[in-house]
Amino acid sequence: MEPIHNPPPQTCSYSRSSTTYTSFKDASCDTKVIRIIIALFLIVISCGLILCAYTFRDLLDADYLAQEGPQQATKLLQQLDDVLTGPPLPIWDNEHLFQFSCLMQNKHKRVLPIDICNPLTKFNFLECICNCLMTKQSVNVNETDMCELFCPPTCTPENYRRLLCTSSVFPFVMWHDPSADTQEAMLTKMDQTMSSGRVGNSHWVLVIVDIEYRCVTFFDSLCDYVASPQQMREQLEGLAVSLGAIYPKEGGADSDQEELLSPFQVRIGSTVKVQSPGEFTCGAWCCQFLAWYLENPDFDLEEKVPKNPSERRALLADFISTTEQAMSRYSSLSWPTTD
């Protein structure tokens, strides 16, 4: 028998020329143009995705109603324009808040600088504010000994006592991170934020207690980041009652006791967002609000702040540039003296 010769199995093969790749240097002119166009297209898409992620939290916060479609579209376009206009504004943190409050004390005299060594949060701010005002009251009537007086590390007890006696406007800043649900968690988050050097979700808000005006004013540049305006008002009304008892109205012997112990007024400084999306300007806005308040406690924020995002940004940028140099004299964090 003759051996059977089976044909070799057929295999599928592809032309090598169809998978040949050339470097950009050796490619033809048409190929180079196509590759450049593709690269530019991918860059544009990547930038768009980054921008979307950058303002994603603000997009989630927007109220989308069918009947308000055009208004919402205009609002988002304004936010986009605000983010893309000019270089980012500087971030003002606790040391800047202290320096600016010292600048205001030097100008107005009745302002107590902000104690940044005693961090306030939504969990302890009511107690801390009451303690500070009670300390002032006891100092005024000479009930507090120098040894018992708690004062910031960068201020002497004698100087702090004098500042307390001459102050009637007390600004307090509150630090907030929405991910912390207890005081311990908030302080831990604060330490982590300071160590990382990143802002994250942290935010500054301002509380002003004015003894002469008998008013408590709350300001949040994002309007409702810590709590809704109504929720904050309810908390501050409890503080206002306590302050009314600490600092009763002046009256004669025949004055009604209930009237003398009437609560302080409560004001919510902003019911609209003045801080632009994508910017970390809460600290600077707190300082700007304090400056306006000291000029006129009855001022209307919405009359001061432009509705146009670009104009609003320009206003804050001008405020920052005109005050940073003057603030630098307090860069050592030493408290101003009353001498």
From Swiss-Prot:
Gene Ontology MF annotations: cysteine-type deubiquitinase activity; deNEDDylase activity
Positions of transmembrane segments: 36-56
Superkingdom of source: Bacteria
Entry EC number(s): 3.4.22.-
Topological category with respect to the lipid bilayer: Single-pass membrane protein
Any one GO CC term of the record: membrane
Catalytic machinery residues: 203, 220, 282
InterPro entries xrefs: Papain-like_cys_pep_sf, Peptidase_C48_C
Pfam families listed in its UniProt record: Peptidase_C48
Biological role: Effector proteins function to alter host cell physiology and promote bacterial survival in host tissues. This protease possesses deubiquitinating and deneddylating activities.
Protein name: Deubiquitinase and deneddylase Dub2
Organism, scientific name: Chlamydia trachomatis serovar L2b (strain UCH-1/proctitis)
Source species taxonomy: Bacteria, Pseudomonadati, Chlamydiota, Chlamydiia, Chlamydiales
